[in-house]
Structure formats: structure tokens, C-alpha cells
């Protein structure tokens, strides 16, 4: 190093001192070289080229000047023809010489000089090394023919009257017009102009042909009839239109030859132009063209972005979107990258839709296509994912990119996005409204297990209907069900409302009860003016404010309602079976609702968390007064309200102290420490103090911690909830959370078994290992052994989730084939099992629990067709599986996103009802079942008052189950067995026939294969009967009778029992005969106050948040959580 340093000479002192003062600037200035760029554009030629060609605005001006110059030359030619007076005679000299005045000649010479100079200049600027390419161009040749003779006449005066075919400048004007339009489109940045250009070219070609023909014939007939311009125009029009009257005809052979030549040119040129125009028109029809900017600025439109458009999706969107009166004038622009299929094209040609729906083929990722759709002027943009894709994650990624592209192009356009998988939701948090399909689906299926038909309830609420479905039906339940299906959620400010204005300063429950009693509306929630959070049933301690926004359920919104007082209504004498608007209550309802006599304190005490108790007063009080209901207080009395603190689990009061102690040691309440994906809403749940080892989560495999290998061995106190899914996706987490929410009583927690086709990953197991009684098993519903091991014989509900791998099929609606057949097998094998099925296509609901010869199902099918013909959005609602809540399709919830355009609160309310979101002070959805002890309440109005006065619950509907009045054809068919009843008397014979009818299900076929084989065996035994005697013959006869009486259901039951015995499972408790085939269930949303309460009715309730009444609710939530892994564990959350 010393040698190297010694080789570098030291700097002189002056440089060192200067560097100290000035730094390195001196050295940099000495080494700098000034470089000028784009020197090639500074030449004279390049400057001219920039002005005449490259610059868009200056080039456009040059083109416009050139076009005007050509038109002027044609105009001067017409003036010359009109001014001349040709001498009489037929000399050929009239063809070559014309009369041209001096001023006209001067103008034509000037125009020719300018045109020739401009043409030569542009040829020089566009010269690329081949001079002949510039000279032999047709525009250049025409310019030479029309300009050079005039320039020569300047130097040779005798040639001033020489004929020059100046009318050919029309073709140069056409060429200049095309260039001008191209420059104009470049200047205004318009690229989608092919159709306009082609139409312009066609029109200009026609005009040039006609103008050339007119001028040519007029000039050539100077030696003949001497036609004027008007006669020439008349002849050309008649000739080109193929009419040919013959009153004006050319006489000279030259003019005739010219006409033939022009017709030949027209036959060659025009078909080419028409062919190009037709091709562009067809392409335009495929791509959809452009949405007019003028219309976008003067009219309102929304854009629907989809990857592929199916007819079902289109009709769902159009029917729901245009169901609202204020949206009738909106246009819908569909932006889709694929071509329209035949069905969509046919629908969009219907006048009702063709005037309001515009289909554009394009991609949301292209700014040009977004510009075509005028996305920046749109009122909203709906972006839908394609759910019928094998790779749903890829479909979500496309949706995310579309949302990003729209937000980048039009940041002020409201976004309504549908996403499939919950782990992708956080990518589009910026969207105004987001519906995650799997979140809603699993939460809805979970609530179906504890609140029956929740999926049907939500589906009816988010569909727009007038409640006119089923009103033409002869059956009363269909009229009631159809009328109540028209109820929707609406909102209004309290001080502006006729329904709720009088309840300012009063409690929420008081307002809800009296509004329902007086107007028939169900107040379900409120929102403060200065708060964005919606509170469902905030409870009796919430005081209504004048600026509160009230959310209520009704047939129509208040603004569209008319009000009549009681006297007017009595005079009208209109008998209504349903209450909508003010109605006269029955006498017993009015007396009961007065609340003049209060019931005892124990009747207003807190219910058990398992459900409200509509118990009668005590025996002592019955002797004094009849049952009555306490009034709903205007302002809650703190001393009289006993809150249902579910944190202490009052539902467990019936348990022994030892059981209660063990239960408290086993469970805790808190927020789940792990979430399988980012963006899941934290929910207060029942949790374990310590997470379960992964090996213990496997239901059918023993481990070192337990030795159980089937569901029966665990000895669960409550029935199972089984979920059959293909994979343990992140959305399945939302199935578990609502069933383990903190407000669910511990005694009523059902064990959850996940029957998965594929093993779950570790992240999912990390999330579910903290929840009590959650297990999984690898198996399939195709395998009977797997079903028996997971405990299907004593399960309360079986949820069959649609498989992603079967969601797409080549034939429409065939995606559900495997699911439908598997569920039908379950339905046959386990008739007592409540099966809840998810389908891809709602149209396939008619195949659920299919019975080919069921007359009642056939009648419902006809009713569905009639409702569809009437234009109903809910034609499928009368299908018994849907009405009972046993089938669901996620596509039914697409209307939730569409309805949010008008009701921006619908997604929030639905998430609160399903338990996907929890807001402090907001209630939750639950249900209670009416028993025989509760029938004293009699009417829905009294039930409403009882719940509001006791615990603050708000009922919103009834799930009713009735016996099926119309028996099926199969249940009426029975085969007489009298010919085999030789050994029995008539009483036993009738007894056996009755048993046979009862044991035969309504869905079996007339002659099942198994029973046919059994009968054949019995006949063979009967033929061999004479060979036996005594007890042997009697035994054979008895076997023969028993075999015949066995129904298909009994055959299947025996098959199941044999498999259970083979697997070592106990057959105790297997009930093969208890089914629900002879009943029908349906929902009554917000029924009238005088609706009778019936036995086994299930009432939907919105129960107040029990934590809202605790003094320190938030600390209690946080402190009650078990000691689990801290924030570091969240870093392992799967993205």
C-alpha cells in the first residue's frame, strides 16, 4: 500500500485551496459538454414535415384548406357550365373547347397553382427514396391533369378556353376529406371510428360517382341534345336506381360509352364498399359500439362488468334493478369480454330491454373499453365474479383487477363488487359495497341449523316483490306465504315519518310494538345521525331521537302508503285476510293489548337463554284474574328490567353445581385468537381454555388423548350438525363462528362435524382448534360407511355444500347433477334427517326430494310457471324445499348487491342478521318454538307485546309447519293383500293393511324392485307350501306375508342397520320411519297482528345484545377471553 500511495503525485497547493473554497465545480465545468437533442428536427424539411404532417392541429388545418380548395374548383366548374351558351351545331370542337370568361379563368388558374404547389410540396415531404411511387399515385396524376393545362394557358393565351375535366377534383376532395377525418380523430384522441369512416367513404364515393356522371354526360352531350345539369342529374338518378324511364337518354356514342363505363365502375366499387361496411357492422354488433357521451352526460347509466354473461344472471340483475320505480330511466351498459350468446341476444332484442340495455364487448382492464362505456360518467359499476369456474381463486383475481382498473380510471364511480373467497376481500376494501359469497353462504347455512329456513327468510327480504305471488292460488297457505314475501326492509328519518314520529323520546321496544299494532310495520333497527353503525333492536333502554334513521319491514315504504283512520276503514267494509296498513284487530287482541292488568313479576323476569317462556301466571294468580300481558313501557324502568346476561349462562341454572363447575372450567368466552384469513370480523365466541391438539380434531381416528373412532362413542348430549364439503376453505370458518357465538347457550351448542373430501390444511386447523366440539373427518357423502361413522343417524342437520369441482358443466344446469343425486340418496336412506342443500342453479330446486308421481308437486310446478308468466322475481318460492329452507342457491343473494344501489344499508343489515358483523349494542337473530304451554298467547300481536314487555325481543316472522292437505297419488295406492290372508281374520287383515299404508312413504315407486323380488320369493314359497305341514307351513306363510308388507323404506332401513352392525356401530336410536314428507313448511315475514299462533310455530326474534346492559361491557369482553397466543400468532395468518 505504501508503494501505491507513493506513485500518486500530490496536487498543487493552488488546486487544493480552490477545491476547499469551491469544491469540485471547477473540475466539473472543465469536463462538461453541452449536448443538443433532436437535431434532426431542426432542418428545414423536418420543420415543414412537422407543420404539414406530424403536428395534428396544423395538419388538420392544411387538410381542411385542401378540401375547401377542391370543392371550390368543382364549384367554379359548375358556374362555368351554367354561364356558357354553346353555339348550335354538332361539331366535335365543342368537346375540346368551351367558353370561359376571363375572371373565371383567373380564379381557376389561381386554384390550380395553389393545388399543384401543395401537392408537389407534400410529395417532397413524404418522399422516401422512390420518386416513381410519388408520381404514379392516382391523386398526383389527377392533380396534374386538372392543374397543368391552366398553368400552360398562362403562357399560351390561345389555350385559355381549352376544356379541362375539373369535375374530377371531386375525387381529390374525397381523398382530402378522408385524410382530414383521420387527422381530426387523432386530434381528439378518438380511435373507435372505423364504422364512421366506412360510412363516410361510402357516401362520398356515391356522391363522387354521381357528380362525375352528371358532369361527364352533360359535357359529352354538347354535340347532341345539349343537356343541362338538371337533366343530367335526373338521368343519372334514374339510371343508377335501375328504374330507367327512357324520357332522357344520351344520343352520342361517346356519352353512351361513358355511361357504360360509369356503371361498370359503380358495380366494382360500390359492392366492395358495402361489403366492408357490412363486415364492420357485424363486428360492431358483436362489440357493441360505444355508449354516447351526450347520453352519458344527459341520462343516467350504470355499468355491469362480468367475465361471462349468462341469461340467469342477466335476468336477475335486470328484474331486481328495474324493480325500483326511480330506476326506470336508467340505462344499463354491460361490459363483457365474450360475445353474446344466443339466449342473451334474444332477450336484449325484446323492446322492454333493447331500449335500456346496451351490450359492449370489451375488457374492464382496457381504458379504451372503459371510455366506450363512459365509466367516468356512470352512476355505479357492478363487478361480478364468475362462480361457475373450476378455479374460483383465479376468478377472484380477475375481479380484483377489474375493480382496480375501474378505480384507477374513474375514482369517483361507486363500486359494487362481488367476491367469491373471503381471503381476497381485503384487496377491494376501497369498494363502496362488497358481498363475499362464501361468507354469506356459510353463515346462512349455519343459521339454518338453529333458526330454520333462515336462508329463505333472507332471500325473500332481499328480493323486490309486491307480495302478489300466490294470490290466485286456492290454498290459503300459499296466499299468506306469497303476501308476506312482499315484505322488505326500508328506512326513514323518524321526524319525517308518520309511522314513528310520535315515538320520539320513547323506548325502541315501545316504538316497535305500537308501530306494528297501529300500522303493521316491524321496526327492527335504528341508526344515529352522527353514527355509521346500524343497531338491530338496541333494546328497551334505547331512546328514540328525532334525527334517528329507522329501519323497518313492510310491504312498501311509507312514502308510497296511504292512511285511513278506523272509522273510514269500517265504512269501507273491505275484508282483508292480511294486515297491511291500519286494520281493525279482533276484540280479544285489542283487550289484550291494552295491558290494563299486569302479570306477576315472574312473568316479566328474564327468560332462559334457550328461548323465551310465555308461561301463564302461577296457580294462585289464576284464581284471582285471567292471564294478561304487561304493557310495553314508554321509557324502560331500570329496576324492572332484568337483563339476560348470557355471559353467566342462566340457561344452565338447571344443571347441578358439579356440572356447572366443569362447564365453566371447560369453556370461556372471548375473541378467537386465530383467523384463517385477513379481514374476518372479530366475533365474541365460546372458546376453549386450551386449544385442542390436531389429532383430537379427527373424529374417526383415535389418538393418545382419546380412543373414540365414531361419533356415537363421544356420547354427545345434543344432536350433531354435519357439514359435507369438498375442501376446508376459509369460508367454512364462517359456518362455525355463528354456531359458537357468545349468545348461544352452552347447553344448546351442537357438535359440528366437517365431512371433507380432502384433508384440511394446518392454517384451518389452527383456527378451529379453539372452538368446542368441532371435529372433522375425511370422507364423502357418496360412501355410506363414511356417513355412518360421522354420526348421520343421530344428526339434527346435514348441510351439503356445493362442490367447486362440479360447479361448471358443459350443459346448462348440469353442474348440480351429482349433488342432487347424492342428496336424494340421503333422503331415501335417512328420511328423518333434516338435509340442507346448496345448489349452483336455483332452477334445479325442483329436483330436491323428487317424487315423480306426487300430484302436489305437479300442482306447485304449474303454479311456478304461472307466476313466472306474470313476471314474478320469486317464481321458485312455492317449491316446498325452498319454502321449508332445505335448499339454497348463492345466486339468490346476487340481488343483495343490486338492491344496495338503492338501499345502501342492506348489506350491513344482512351481515348483522347472519352474525358476520357484531356491533356493540346491536341485537342478533334467534328463534323460539311455540309449545302447547304457549298457546294461551293466541295472536301474533299479543306475542309481540309479551316479548317487548318482558325481555325486549322483537319478532320479525313465523316459520310454520302444516300437514300436507293434498295427499300424493302414491300414498293413495295400496295393494290389497286379501288373497294372502288365509290364516288371519278380518280384523287382523285391516290392521295389517293400515300398518302397510302407514309404513309406505309418499315418495316410493308403485312397485319397487326389492319388494318385487320379495313377492316373487313369497310366491315360490307358496308353491312349495303343500310339501310342508303344521308349524313349518305356518312359518313359511308368515314369512311370505312379512316380506310382502316390507316397503322400500324398510328395505333401505335394513340395509343401513346391516352396515352399522358391520362397522360395529350401535343401531339404537336409528329411526327409519320418522320423516317430514307429509308436512309443508313456509315463512310468514311480518304477519298481521291478528295472525293466530299455532302449535310448533317457530318465531324469528331479534334479541337485544346482552352485553349492552353490562356496566363495563367492553372490558368484560376483553377480560373474559382465555389466555391464548398473542399478536405474534396473527402473523401466520394465511393470505
Swiss-Prot record:
Record InterPro entries: K_chnl_BK_asu, K_chnl_dom, K_chnl_Slo-like, NAD(P)-bd_dom_sf, RCK_N
Basic residues bias locations: 1017-1030
Any one annotated GO CC term: plasma membrane
Regulation: Are normally in a closed state unless activated by an increase in intracellular Na(+) and Cl(-). Inhibited upon stimulation of G-protein coupled receptors, such as CHRM1 and GRM1. There is conflicting data about the effect of ATP on KNCT2 channels activity. Intracellular ATP was initially report to inhibit the channel activity. However, others studies conclude that KNCT2 channels are not inhibited by intracellular ATP.
Keywords attached to this entry: Cell membrane, Disease variant, Epilepsy, Glycoprotein, Ion channel, Ion transport, Membrane, Phosphoprotein, Potassium, Potassium channel, Potassium transport, Transmembrane, Transmembrane helix, Transport
Extracellular side: 85-101, 159-164, 220-228, 250-256
UniProt keyword annotation of Transmembrane present: yes
All residue ranges annotated as the RCK N-terminal domain in the record: 299-435, 718-858
Biased composition (Polar residues): 1118-1127
Disease connection: Developmental and epileptic encephalopathy 57: A form of epileptic encephalopathy, a heterogeneous group of severe early-onset epilepsies characterized by refractory seizures, neurodevelopmental impairment, and poor prognosis. Development is normal prior to seizure onset, after which cognitive and motor delays become apparent. DEE57 is an autosomal dominant condition.
Catalysed reaction, written as an equation: K(+)(in) = K(+)(out)
Any one GO molecular-function label of the UniProt entry: outward rectifier potassium channel activity
Chief localization: membrane
List of glycosylated residues: 99
Transmembrane segments: 64-84, 102-122, 138-158, 165-185, 199-219, 257-277
Membrane topology, as annotated: Multi-pass membrane protein
Impact after mutating residue 282 to A: Does not induce constitutive opening
Effect seen on changing residue 267 to N: Constitutively open channel
Protein name (database record): Potassium channel subfamily T member 2
Coiled coil segments of this chain: none
PROSITE patterns named in the record: RCK_N
Effect after changing residue 33 to I: In a breast cancer sample; somatic mutation
A Pfam family per the record: BK_channel_a
Localization of this protein: Cell membrane
Originating gene: KCNT2
Cytoplasmic domain ranges by topology: 1-63, 123-137, 186-198, 278-1135
Record note on domains: The consensus ATP binding site (1025-GPKHSGKT-1032) seems to be non-functional.
Amino acid at each position: 500500500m505504501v508503494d501505491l500511495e507513493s506513485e500518486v503525485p500530490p496536487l498543487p497547493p493552488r488546486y487544493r485551496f480552490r477545491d476547499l473554497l469551491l469544491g469540485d465545480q471547477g473540475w466539473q465545468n472543465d469536463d462538461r459538454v453541452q449536448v443538443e437533442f433532436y437535431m434532426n428536427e431542426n432542418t428545414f424539411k423536418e420543420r415543414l414535415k412537422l407543420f404539414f404532417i406530424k403536428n395534428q392541429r396544423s395538419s388538420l388545418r392544411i387538410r381542411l384548406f385542401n378540401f375547401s380548395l377542391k370543392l371550390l374548383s368543382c364549384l367554379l366548374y359548375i358556374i362555368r357550365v351554367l354561364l356558357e351558351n354553346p353555339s348550335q351545331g354538332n361539331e366535335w370542337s365543342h368537346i375540346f373547347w368551351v367558353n370561359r370568361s376571363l375572371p373565371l379563368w383567373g380564379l381557376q388558374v389561381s386554384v390550380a397553382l395553389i393545388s399543384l404547389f401543395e401537392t408537389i410540396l407534400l410529395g417532397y415531404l413524404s418522399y422516401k427514396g422512390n420518386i416513381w411511387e410519388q408520381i404514379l399515385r392516382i391523386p398526383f396524376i389527377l392533380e396534374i391533369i386538372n392543374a397543368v393545362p391552366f398553368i400552360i394557358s398562362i403562357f399560351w393565351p390561345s389555350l385559355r378556353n381549352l376544356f379541362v375535366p375539373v369535375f374530377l377534383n371531386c375525387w381529390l376532395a374525397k381523398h382530402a376529406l378522408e385524410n382530414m377525418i383521420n387527422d381530426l380523430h387523432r386530434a381528439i384522441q378518438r380511435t373507435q371510428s372505423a364504422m364512421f369512416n366506412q360510412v363516410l367513404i361510402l357516401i362520398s364515393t356515391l356522391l363522387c360517382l354521381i357528380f362525375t356522371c352528371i358532369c361527364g354526360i352533360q359535357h359529352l352531350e354538347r354535340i347532341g341534345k345539349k343537356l343541362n345539369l338538371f337533366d343530367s342529374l335526373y338521368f343519372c338518378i334514374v339510371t343508377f336506381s335501375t328504374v330507367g324511364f327512357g324520357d332522357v337518354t344520351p344520343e352520342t356514342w361517346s356519352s353512351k360509352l361513358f355511361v357504360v363505363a360509369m356503371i361498370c365502375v359503380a358495380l366494382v366499387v360500390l359492392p366492395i364498399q358495402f361489403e366492408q361496411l357490412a363486415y364492420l357492422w357485424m363486428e360492431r354488433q358483436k362489440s357493441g359500439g360505444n355508449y354516447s357521451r351526450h347520453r352519458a352526460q344527459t341520462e343516467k347509466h350504470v355499468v355491469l362488468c362480468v367475465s361471462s354473461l349468462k341469461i340467469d344472471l342477466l335476468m336477475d340483475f335486470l328484474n331486481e334493478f328495474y324493480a325500483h320505480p326511480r330506476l326506470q330511466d336508467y340505462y344499463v351498459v354491460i361490459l363483457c369480454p365474450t360475445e353474446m350468446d344466443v339466449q342473451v341476444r334474444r332477450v336484449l332484442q325484446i323492446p322492454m330491454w333493447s331500449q335500456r340495455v346496451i351490450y359492449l364487448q370489451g375488457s374492464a382492464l382496457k381504458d379504451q373499453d372503459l371510455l366506450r362505456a363512459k365509466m367516468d360518467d356512470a352512476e355505479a359499476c357492478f363487478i361480478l365474479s364468475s362462480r361457475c369456474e373450476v378455479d374460483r381463486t383465479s376468478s377472484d383475481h380477475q375481479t380484483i383487477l377489474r375493480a382496480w382498473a375501474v378505480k384507477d380510471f374513474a375514482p369517483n364511480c361507486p363500486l359494487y363488487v362481488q367476491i367469491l373467497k373471503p381471503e381476497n376481500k381485503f384487496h377491494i376494501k376501497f369498494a363502496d359495497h362488497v358481498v363475499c359469497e362464501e361468507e354469506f353462504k356459510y353463515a346462512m347455512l349455519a343459521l339454518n341449523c338453529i333458526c330454520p329456513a333462515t336462508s329463505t327468510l333472507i332471500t325473500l327480504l332481499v328480493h323486490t316483490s309486491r307480495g302478489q305471488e300466490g294470490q290466485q292460488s286456492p290454498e290459503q297457505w300459499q296466499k299468506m306465504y306469497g303476501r308476506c314475501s312482499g315484505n322488505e326492509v326500508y328506512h326513514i328519518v323518524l321526524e319525517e315519518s308518520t309511522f314513528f314520529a310520535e315515538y320520539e323520546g320513547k323506548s325502541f321496544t315501545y316504538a316497535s310494538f305500537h308501530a306494528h299494532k297501529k300500522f303493521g310495520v316491524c321496526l327492527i333497527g335504528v341508526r344515529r345521525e352522527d353514527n355509521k353503525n346500524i343497531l338491530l333492536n338496541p333494546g328497551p333502554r334505547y331512546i328514540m331521537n328525532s334525527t334517528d334513521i329507522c329501519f323497518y319491514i313492510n310491504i312498501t315504504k311509507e312514502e308510497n302508503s296511504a292512511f285511513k283512520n278506523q272509522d273510514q276503514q269500517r265504512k269501507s267494509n273491505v275484508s282483508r285476510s292480511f294486515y297491511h296498513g291500519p286494520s281493525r284487530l279482533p276484540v280479544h287482541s285489542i283487550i289484550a293489548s291494552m295491558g290494563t292488568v299486569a302479570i306477576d313479576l315472574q312473568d316479566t323476569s328474564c327468560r332462559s337463554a334457550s328461548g323465551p317462556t310465555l308461561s301463564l301466571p302461577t296457580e294462585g294468580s289464576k284464581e284471582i284474574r285471567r292471564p294478561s300481558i304487561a304493557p310495553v313501557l314508554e321509557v324502560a324502568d331500570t329496576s324492572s328490567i332484568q337483563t339476560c346476561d348470557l355471559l353467566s349462562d342462566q340457561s344452565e341454572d338447571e344443571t347441578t353445581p358439579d356440572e356447572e363447575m366443569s362447564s365453566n372450567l371447560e369453556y370461556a368466552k372471548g375473541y378467537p385468537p386465530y383467523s384463517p384469513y385477513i379481514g374476518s370480523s372479530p366475533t365474541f365466541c365460546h372458546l376453549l381454555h386450551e386449544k385442542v391438539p390436531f389429532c383430537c380434531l379427527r373424529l374417526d381416528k383415535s389418538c393418545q388423548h382419546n380412543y373414540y373412532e365414531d361419533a356415537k362413542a363421544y356420547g354427545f348430549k345434543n344432536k350433531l350438525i354435519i357439514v359435507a364439503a369438498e375442501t376446508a376453505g376459509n369460508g367454512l370458518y364462517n359456518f362455525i363462528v355463528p354456531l359458537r357465538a357468545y349468545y348461544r347457550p352452552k347447553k344448546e351448542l351442537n357438535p359440528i362435524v366437517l365431512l371433507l373430501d380432502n384433508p384440511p390444511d394446518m392454517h384451518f386447523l389452527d383456527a378451529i382448534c379453539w372452538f368446542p366440539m368441532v371435529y372433522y373427518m375425511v370422507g364423502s357423502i357418496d360412501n355410506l360407511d363414511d356417513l355412518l361413522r360421522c354420526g348421520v343417524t343421530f344428526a339434527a342437520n346435514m348441510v351439503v355444500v356445493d362442490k367447486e369441482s362440479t360447479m361448471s358443466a358443459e350443459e346448462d344446469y348440469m353442474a348440480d347433477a351429482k349433488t342432487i343425486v347424492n342428496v336424494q340418496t340421503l333422503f331415501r336412506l335417512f328420511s328423518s334427517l333434516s338435509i340442507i342443500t346448496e345448489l349452483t342453479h336455483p332452477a334445479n330446486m325442483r329436483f330436491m326430494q323428487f317424487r315423480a308421481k306426487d300430484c302436489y308437486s305437479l300442482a306447485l310446478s304449474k303454479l311456478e310457471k304461472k307466476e313466472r308468466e306474470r313476471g314474478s322475481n320469486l317464481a321458485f318460492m312455492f317449491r316446498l324445499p325452498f319454502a321449508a329452507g332445505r335448499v339454497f342457491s348463492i345466486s339468490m343473494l346476487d340481488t343483495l348487491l343490486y338492491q344496495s344501489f338503492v338501499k345502501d344499508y342492506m348489506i350491513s343489515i344482512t351481515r348483522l342478521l347472519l352474525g358476520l358483523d357484531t356491533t356493540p349494542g346491536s341485537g342478533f337473530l334467534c328463534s323460539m318454538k311455540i309449545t302447547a304451554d304457549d298457546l294461551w298467547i293466541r295472536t301474533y300481536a299479543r306475542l309481540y307485546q309479551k316479548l317487548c314487555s318482558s325481555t325486549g325481543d322483537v319478532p320479525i316472522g313465523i316459520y310454520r309447519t302444516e300437514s300436507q292437505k293434498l295427499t300424493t297419488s302414491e300414498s293413495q295406492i295400496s295393494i290389497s293383500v286379501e288373497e294372502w290372508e288365509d290364516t288371519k281374520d278380518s280384523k287382523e287383515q285391516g290392521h295389517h293393511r293400515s300398518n302397510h299404508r302407514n309404513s309406505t312413504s309418499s315418495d316410493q315407486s308403485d312397485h319397487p324392485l326389492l319388494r318385487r323380488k320379495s313377492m316373487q320369493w313369497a310366491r315360490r314359497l307358496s308353491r312349495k307350501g303343500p310339501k310342508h305341514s303344521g308349524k313349518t307351513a305356518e312359518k313359511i306363510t308368515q314369512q311370505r306375508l312379512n316380506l310382502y308388507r316390507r316397503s322400500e323404506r324398510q328395505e333401505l332401513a335394513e340395509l343401513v342397520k346391516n352396515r352399522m352392525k358391520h362397522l360395529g356401530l350401535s343401531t339404537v336410536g336409528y329411526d327409519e320411519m320418522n320423516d317430514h314428507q307429509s308436512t309443508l313448511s313456509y315463512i310468514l315475514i311480518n304477519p298481521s297482528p291478528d295472525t293466530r299462533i299455532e302449535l310448533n310455530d317457530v318465531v324469528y326474534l331479534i334479541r337485544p345484545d346482552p352485553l349492552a346492559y353490562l356496566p363495563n361491557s367492553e372490558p368484560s369482553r376483553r377480560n373474559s377471553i382465555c389466555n391464548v397466543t398473542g399478536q405474534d400468532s396473527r402473523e401466520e395468518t394465511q393470505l
